[in-house]
Amino acid sequence: MGQIEWAMWANEQALASGLILITGGIVATAGQFTQWYLGAYSIAAGVLVCLLEYPRGKRSKGSTMERCGQKYLTRVVKLFGPLTRNYYIRAFLHLGLAVPAGFLLATILGTACLAIASGIYLLAAIRGEQWSPIEPKPKERPQIGGTIKQPPSNPPPRPPAEARKKPSEEAAGVPTGGPQENPMPVNDEVV
Amino acid sequence: MAVSWRSWLANEGVKHLCLLIWLSLNVLLFWKTFLLYNQGPEYHYLHEMLGLGLCLSRASASVLNLNCSLILLPMCRTLLAFLRGSQKVPSRRTRRLLDKSRTFHITCGVTICIFSGVHVAAHLVNALNFSVNYREDFVELNAARYREEDPRKLLFTTVPGLTGVCMVLVLFLMFTASTYAIRVSNYDIFWYTHNLFFVFYMLLMLHVSGSVQLLSCVQLSVTPWTAARQASLSITNCLSCLHHPVVLHQYQRNEHSFFTNTMKRGLLKYQTNLDTHPPGCINLNGTHYQNTHLPEHLSEHFHESFPGGFSKPDELTQNTFVKICMEEPRFQANFPQTWLWISGPLCLYCAERLYRCIRSNKPVTIISVTSHPSDVVEIRMVKENFKARPGQYIILHCPSVSALENHPFTLTMCPTETKATFGVHLKIVGDWTERFRDLLLPPSSQDSEILPFIQSRNYPKLYIDGPFGSPFEESLNYEVSLCVAGGIGVTPFASILNTLLDDWKPYKLRRLYFIWVCRDIQSFRWFADLLCVLYNKFWQENRPDYVNIQLYLSQTDGIQKIIGEKYQALNSRLFIGRPRWKLLFDEIAKCNRGKTVGVFCCGPNSISKTLHKLSNRNNSYGTRFEYNKESFS
C-alpha cells in the first residue's frame, strides 16, 4: 500500500465528476427546473474541472500514459505554476466548486462525486505528491553516418572488430602498421 | 491482403455471435419492460402521474438486473478452469469463448454504469413528478407525503433513495479505479476498490426491497415527553413492521395519518383489481379517474367525466362504453425481481470463493530457489493433491511480504505422475517481488546460481491459489501450433515444453513452432537448458521437426553475441533483429497446407496485434490460423 499514487485516481475521479456535473447541469437547464441558474453554474464548473483535470500528471516512478491530445492543455495548465502544481489548492478548489451544485436535485450526484475527488486529492497532497507536466521527448533525429567513427584502414578480408582492436597485445614479431596479419611476408620488390 | 472469411469466421465469429445474443437479450428486456409500463393497464395511474420517467427507469432497471447477474459469472475462475479441462465442453470453439471472459465482464460493467446513469436520471425526474403530481385519489400510489414536497427529501429519506445514492457512489469509486491507466500503474487501487462490489450487492438487495416505513417511522418523535415512549414504540414497530403491517396500522391510526400511506412496501405499485376497476372508469360518487393533468377541482364536476372516446369513434371499443367502477383501485408493490436474478450468481461466486479459500489454506513446501540472469527467480515447490495442466497459472500469497496482496504467476513446470514438483519463474519488477526475493535469497548470495537446500530452513510461508485456466492450454490440442513469446512471456510455453519433454505422444500436437523474442541475450539462459534437452530428445527419437525453435534478439549493440558455449543448437538458431512475421506465416502456411494452425502469443501488445491481423489474412495454401490470446491487466 505504501507506493500507491493517489493523485492519479483523484484525477480520474475529478474528470468523471466534471462530466457528471455537465450532464446534470444540461438536464437542469433544459428541463427548466426551478433554480435553473444553478444548472448553468454547474455546466460552467464542470467544464472548468474537466479542462483542469484533462492533462494527466507524471508518475514519480515509471512511464505515464498520456491522454489523447493532452499536450496542448498541459502547456496551459503549466502556466499557472504553483496554483496547479499543488494538490492542496486543487482539493479546496474542487470542494468549493462542488458546494453550490449541491442545492439542485439534478446536480447533487455531481457534487458528491466531486467532493470524494477533492478528498482523495487532499490525501495525495498530505502524502506530498505534486503535479508535474509530461514533457514531450525531444525527437532523436537519426544522424546519418553518426556511428561511423573512422573508415576502415584495411582492404577486405577484414578480421572481426575484436581482433582489430588488439594490435598492441599481439606477440612481438607482428609487423606494426595495421592489424592485418599477412600469412606470408610481402615485399614490394620485384625480383 | 484480403481478409479471409473462413479465417475471420473461425477467429472472430463465435465471439461476435455471443455478443449479438447478449445485446439482443438486453434490447428485448428493455423494450418489453418499457412497453409494459407505458401501456399496461395495471400501471395506468402510475404512468399518468410519472410519465416517461417511469418507463425509462423500470426498463433500465431490468437491463441492470440482467447485467448485475451476468457480470459475476466470468469471475468464477475455478469453474471456468474446470470447464476448460473437462470433456463436458468438447468443442474447441466453445472453449475459446472462455478466453473472452474478462472482456465480457468489462462489457457488462460498462453497461451497468451507463444504465445506472439512465436509471438515476429517470428516478430523479420521477421524484420531481411524485411531488408535483401528487394525487389525493390514490394516496397509496404516492411516494411523496404531500404536494410539492421537496424531491430531495424523497431521495434521502426513503430506503430506495438512500441506498440508491450510496450505490451510485460505490459504483463511481469502482468505475474510476478500473480504467486502463490505473490498472497499469496502480493495480492496488483497482483491486481494493473492486472488492467493494460486495457492498454494492448488499445495497442492491436493500434497494429493491423498498421498505419505505423503515425510515419514516424514525421521524416520529412528536413532543419531548412522549418522545421516549414513541421512539421506543417506533423502533420496535420498525422491527416488526416488516412482518406485521396490519399491527403497525393499528398503532399508528391515531398518530399521523400520512404514515398509513407508506404501509405497503415498495415505491412503485401496480393495480391489483383490474376487473372490478378498469382504469379510466367513472366512479358514480363523483371522483373522476381520468385526465389527471387537469387540476383537481375541475375534475370533480360530473359533466366532464365522460370519457374522451366519444369524440373519436375509431378508438378502441372500450372507450365508447362508460365504465362504472365497482370499487376503489387497490395497489400492491411488485415482488423484488432482482432478488431472483442475482441470488443465483452471487451464491455461486461466494461458494467458489469459499472453495478457493479452503483449498489454499495449506502452505506449500519450497524445495529450491534459483536466481537467473536478468532479474528472474525460479521457485520449485511441492504441495499435496496439487494437479495442474500445462499453461495454467497460480496466485501466490506470502503473508510475510504483504498481508493483502496476491499476485498471479504462470506455472513453468507442472506436476506429473512421476514428479510432484512444480515451479514458477518470477521477474522482479515491483516492490512485492523485490521484497519476496529478499526473503527467499539473502542479499549476500544473490549472485550465486543455486541455493543449497540446507540453507533454506528459513523460507517464508507461501500459499497458492489455483490453478486457473488460460488459453495456452489449447496449444497441445492443435496439430500444429505457433507459440510466440516476448521476454518473460515465455513462461506458459515453458510448461508446455516441460510436458513435451515428459511425454509427447498422448497429445494431438505434432509440430510446434516456438518463437522467442528477447531484448537481452542473457534472458535466453532461463530456459536454454530445457530447449537443448528437448531438442536432443526429439533428435534421438527421429522427429527433428517436432519443435522448430527460433530465437530473436531484438536489441543489439553491434557486438556479436552467443548464448553460451554449450548451447550450440540455440546459437545456430539465434537471429539478430525483430522477426518478420509475414514471412514466417507464409513459410508455416506453405509447410502445413490445409491444416489448422493454433497461434498463441504471450508478449507485448504490438506483437499481439500484428499476429491477430496476420491470422485473419488469406493465404494461397489453404492453411487456417486460429488466434488465441491471453489478456493481462
Swiss-Prot record, chain A:
Pfam family, one: Cytochrom_B558a
Disulfide bonds: none
Amino-acid biosynthesis is among the record's keywords: no
InterPro entries to which the protein is assigned, alphabetical: Cyt_b558_asu
Annotated localization: Cell membrane
Modification Phosphoserine, positions: 168
Region feature Disordered, mapped onto this chain: 134-191
Crosslink position(s): Glycyl lysine isopeptide (Lys-Gly) (interchain with G-Cter in ubiquitin): 149
Residue intervals annotated with topology Cytoplasmic: 2-7, 54-69, 81-86, 127-191
Keywords (A to Z) from UniProt: Cell membrane, Electron transport, Heme, Iron, Isopeptide bond, Membrane, Metal-binding, NADP, Oxidoreductase, Phosphoprotein, Transmembrane, Transmembrane helix, Transport, Ubl conjugation
Positions of transmembrane segments: 8-30, 36-53, 87-104, 106-126
GO BP term (any one): mucus secretion
Quaternary context: Component of the phagocyte NADPH oxidase core complex/cytochrome b558 complex, composed of CYBB (heavy chain (beta)) and CYBA (light chain (alpha)). Component of the phagocyte NADPH oxidase complex composed of an obligatory core heterodimer formed by the membrane proteins CYBA and CYBB and the cytosolic regulatory subunits NCF1/p47-phox, NCF2/p67-phox, NCF4/p40-phox and the small GTPase RAC1 or RAC2. Interacts with NCF1 (via SH3 domain). Interacts with SH3PXD2A. Interacts with DUOX1, DUOX2 and TPO. Interacts with NOX4; this interaction mediates superoxide generation.
Reported function: Subunit of NADPH oxidase complexes that is required for the NADPH oxidase activity that generates, in various cell types, superoxide from molecular oxygen utilizing NADPH as an electron donor. Subunit of the phagocyte NADPH oxidase complex that mediates the transfer of electrons from cytosolic NADPH to O2 to produce the superoxide anion (O2(-)). In the activated complex, electrons are first transferred from NADPH to flavin adenine dinucleotide (FAD) and subsequently transferred via two heme molecules to molecular oxygen, producing superoxide through an outer-sphere reaction.
Protein name: Cytochrome b-245 light chain
Gene: CYBA
